[in-house]
Regions:
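Extended, highly charged
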Residues: 2-405
Length: 405
């Protein structure tokens, strides 16, 4: 089925125009991919009303090769992303979302993605020896990270071995070299289940990683949908319109036709490398660097002047803790009322509690900083580096503008 006129390409640039019109987007010029982007983003999201940040003029890269952070971190932007009308306050947004996830899930089967013949994502194609992940300003987000993470606000597209189930999940993606990335998937996650099935069968695991599209894509790929359901269907139910996808030339996996960057390849049986450590959502470096699947990248597709969607974790509040808190607050209100709890005036699940306790308990026993102590990491080291390193007048001016808001 091909009908792009009635489908949605998940175009990030269309959403950026909307965010700018709302007064919710700030341009930052001259920040370095090496720690500065991460430190500025972390300090920004600690504000009461943080703007989305669009970084350009990044050292070592052509003008127009950009990075976006903090996309979901305000009620105005999140309500825009979820297509629920302008909601100016946390409480209004939570109330508006009550019952919505159940509705979206119930109608998801009506919105199979629509395959388009082509799309802007194919403006440029790297193949073979031309593949170079360092063509893009993937940040080193935290000082002690194991490498540059091109995938934080990403969508990892995979397929089941023995069915037609397409899964779209968010897993961190670290660059090893010009054509290899590490893919960290927590055991039990749907992508990890599909990966394990391929490995047990001795077959290569096809992967397409979307590095930037409408934030709705990243938002839904990072939540829990029922086993066997494709996230594209869920997104379509929110949009009330199918997602427009194109097929990868290598793997035939579907990805949004207006994606900014897509890297495509295979994880081969037995091919693992050390990945991490990485400063995570609870404000710690959990555990130590460990082996993770390696994806050999054989194709890169990207738009002219591509934009990386970044979502760097940090001690809450962080880049995505607001969206998690809002979504889970809405679910909690519904659960309380369904349980017969009277006189519920409102619910707010704290951002520091926006992840499951099981995740926290599993991680906390192994949390160490790189000096061997149990301790938090924060932006302090990165920010100290930033203060030393920022020499550009334009960058300093951009930062002052951010923190006057």
């Amino acid at each position: 089925m091909t009908d792009s006129s009635t489908s949605h390409p998940l175009d990030l640039r269309a959403w950026l125009d909307e965010a700018r019109a709302l007064g919710e987007l700030t341009d930052v010029s001259g920040a370095d991919w090496n720690l500065e982007l991460g430190a500025i983003s972390e300090l920004n999201v600690k504000k009461e009303r943080p703007a989305a940040l669009l970084f350009d003029d990044i050292p070592d890269y052509p003008q127009g090769h950009r990075v976006l952070t903090c996309s979901t971190a305000s009620p105005a932007r999140l309500s825009s992303i979820l297509r629920v009308g302008h909601q100016p306050t946390h409480r209004a947004l939570v109330e508006t979302l009550r019952g919505k996830p159940k509705q979206w899930q119930a109608h998801a089967h009506e919105y199979d993605p629509v395959t388009a013949a082509s799309g802007p994502v194919f403006d440029n194609v790297q193949t073979g020896g031309d593949v170079d992940l360092f063509s893009f300003p993937a940040p080193l987000w935290h000082e002690k990270d194991g490498g540059r993470y091109i995938g934080t606000g990403c969508m990892v597209v995979t397929k089941d071995l023995d069915s037609e189930w397409i899964n779209v999940g968010t897993y961190r993606v670290m660059i090893h070299d010009r054509n290899h990335v590490g893919l960290d998937m927590i055991p039990g996650k749907h992508g990890a289940i599909q990966y394990d099935k391929h490995m047990k069968a001795g077959k290569p695991f096809p992967v397409a990683i979307v590095i930037g599209c409408d934030p709705l894509g990243y938002l839904i790929s990072g939540i829990e949908v029922p086993f066997g359901m494709c996230e594209y269907n869920y997104i379509g139910a929110i949009l009330k319109k199918p997602v427009s996808v194109v097929k990868g030339q290598l793997t035939d996996l579907p990805f949004p036709s207006a994606s900014e960057i897509v890297i495509e390849g295979y994880a081969h049986p037995g091919d693992v490398r050390i990945e991490g450590p990485f400063g995570e959502f609870h404000g710690y470096y959990p555990g130590k660097a460990e082996t993770a699947p390696v994806v050999t990248i054989e194709r890169i597709y990207y738009r002219n002047n591509p934009i990386i969607m970044g979502s760097p974790p940090a001690k809450p509040p962080n880049d995505y803790s607001y969206s998690k808190a809002v979504m889970r607050s809405a679910l909690l209100v519904d659960a309380l009322q369904a349980a017969g709890v009277p006189d519920v005036a409102g619910v707010w699940r704290m951002r520091s509690a926006a992840r499951a306790c099981s995740t926290w308990c599993r991680s906390v026993s192994a949390m160490r900083d790189t000096r061997g102590r149990r301790d938090t990491f924060s932006a302090s080291a990165a920010w100290a580096h930033t203060c030393r390193a920022i020499r550009s007048w334009s960058t300093r001016t951009s930062i002052r503008r951010i923190f006057r808001r």
